């Protein structure tokens, strides 16, 4: 097996591990205690240790924390601006979902966290997020800061050829729905359409208007 084949195999394995890790982090509880039961993909509700405190650098150059960024329901995605297709497609989908939600009266923030510390400087991120959505918040940071955020969200990335200015980066592609008070609510895979994401997020936001006790999701806020 050559180097590229080994890298692809490792990336595929890691992608499976990420999905399994997210699933393992979700604890099912009875429907009757969960006001979000009708919104979730599974048969139970989720109290998940996904998300948590982070310190990163915004596209404005300011140092920010999760409390500064996730001030309203947010769609959080990990990627990189030099990504040839996956990241632009997923980010466009998230931006379209946010626009649909705005038409329905819901204010949701799309957040793009870069896993490419070397190339995704604040100005580069600004150019990328401006193309996606004026609402999108771009975040980068040192490798250590990015690693901490990736770990908190049970995400994954692998820089194939460190030092190569044209290197590709393998990474997980789930989008996380986060609430500033409750933390993690659900996640969306790449096959979810803007309409599917908007319908799901809208369900959660409508349910948030209904008083009830749903287990907090461990985002550290």
From Swiss-Prot:
Cu cation binds at residues 83, 87, 171. GO terms for biological process: photosynthesis; positive regulation of cytochrome-c oxidase activity. Pfam families: SCO1-SenC. It comes from the Bacteria. PROSITE patterns: THIOREDOXIN_2. Keywords: Copper, Metal-binding, Photosynthesis. InterPro entries: SCO1/SenC (IPR003782), Thioredoxin-like_sf (IPR036249), Thioredoxin_domain (IPR013766). SUPFAM superfamilies: Thioredoxin-like. Residues 45-210 form the Thioredoxin domain. The keyword Metal-binding applies. One of its GO terms (molecular function) is metal ion binding. Belongs to the SCO1/2 family. Involved in both aerobic respiration and photosynthesis gene expression. PANTHER family: ELECTRON TRANSPORT PROTIN SCO1/SENC FAMILY MEMBER (PTHR12151), LINALOOL DEHYDRATASE_ISOMERASE DOMAIN-CONTAINING PROTEIN (PTHR12151:SF25). This is Protein SenC. The gene is senC.
